[in-house]
């Protein structure tokens, strides 16, 4: 089965391939542009994207949106994570966190799958914001996020280690389970 992943992010595609190729699913990156609405939840953003793309893509496809929610910043950057990353970056987040003791945060990922119907798969991971950027792997906020139970950032982990605990890894596991069950039908 071929599955389009509507994204320009090679890191997301690499992570999805590791989960889905064992099911015989060929994940193909398809970098189509689609509007990302400013909404209250990641789920709303993903559902809008699926509905916008469904008449433009001729194969089953997935999109994914994720956000970093920092407790001391009232959930900021949250649904605006991509925009905030592009504008103030990791240094901007670390500057906002200067002198703040409560560094608790969580990442949330929502994968939307369209096969004639809309299906959502959600994953979350709790952790904290590090005091500085660490690590060379991953992408986005990975160099400043330390998941609970670890002393290293996502950027200091291998793809396999990160996938075993990450928000996207958890959402991909849910999608994998669903696909495994429904591919048989």
UniProtKB/Swiss-Prot annotation:
Assigned keywords, A-Z: Hydrolase, Magnesium, Metal-binding, Nucleotide metabolism, Nucleotide-binding
Q: Which cofactors, if any, are listed as required? A: Mg(2+)
Q: Which reaction does it catalyse?
A: XTP + H2O = XMP + diphosphate + H(+); dITP + H2O = dIMP + diphosphate + H(+); ITP + H2O = IMP + diphosphate + H(+)
Give Gene Ontology CC terms. cytoplasm
* Catalytic residue positions: 65
This entry's Enzyme Commission designation comes to 3.6.1.66
SS bond partners:
none
A Pfam family of this chain? Ham1p_like
GO biological process terms on file: nucleotide metabolic process; purine nucleoside triphosphate catabolic process
Residue sites binding substrate per the record: 7-12, 66, 139-142, 162, 167-168
Enzymatic class = hydrolase
Question: What remark does the entry make about the cofactor?
Answer: Binds 1 Mg(2+) ion per subunit.
Residues at which Mg(2+) binds: 36, 65
InterPro entries, per this entry? dITP/XTP_pyrophosphatase, ITPase-like_fam, RdgB/HAM1
Gene3D superfamilies linked: 3.90.950.10
PANTHER family per UniProt:
INOSINE TRIPHOSPHATE PYROPHOSPHATASE (PTHR11067:SF9), INOSINE TRIPHOSPHATE PYROPHOSPHATASE/HAM1 PROTEIN (PTHR11067)
Fill in the subunit field for this protein.
Homodimer.
The entry sums up its family as follows: Belongs to the HAM1 NTPase family.
Its annotated function is as follows: Pyrophosphatase that catalyzes the hydrolysis of nucleoside triphosphates to their monophosphate derivatives, with a high preference for the non-canonical purine nucleotides XTP (xanthosine triphosphate), dITP (deoxyinosine triphosphate) and ITP. Seems to function as a house-cleaning enzyme that removes non-canonical purine nucleotides from the nucleotide pool, thus preventing their incorporation into DNA/RNA and avoiding chromosomal lesions.
* Name of the protein described by the UniProt record: dITP/XTP pyrophosphatase
Look up and give the organism this protein is from. Pyrococcus furiosus (strain ATCC 43587 / DSM 3638 / JCM 8422 / Vc1)
């Amino acid at each position: 089965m071929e599955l389009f992943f509507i994204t320009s992010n090679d890191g997301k595609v690499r992570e999805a391939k590791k989960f889905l190729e064992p099911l015989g699913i060929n994940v193909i990156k398809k970098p189509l542009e689609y509007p990302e609405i400013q909404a209250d939840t990641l789920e709303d953003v993903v559902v809008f994207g699926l509905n916008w793309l469904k008449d433009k893509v001729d194969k089953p496809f997935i999109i994914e949106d994720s956000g970093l929610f920092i407790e001391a910043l009232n959930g900021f950057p949250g649904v605006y994570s991509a925009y905030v990353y592009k504008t103030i970056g990791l240094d901007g987040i670390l500057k906002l966190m200067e002198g703040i003791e409560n560094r608790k945060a969580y990442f949330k990922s929502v994968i939307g799958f369209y096969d004639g119907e809309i299906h959502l798969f959600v994953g979350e991971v709790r952790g904290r914001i590090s005091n500085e950027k660490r690590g060379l792997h991953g992408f986005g906020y990975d160099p400043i996020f330390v998941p609970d139970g670890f002393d290293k950032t996502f950027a200091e982990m291998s793809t396999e280690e990160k996938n075993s605990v990450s928000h996207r890894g958890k959402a991909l596991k849910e999608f994998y389970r669903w696909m495994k069950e429904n591919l048989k039908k």
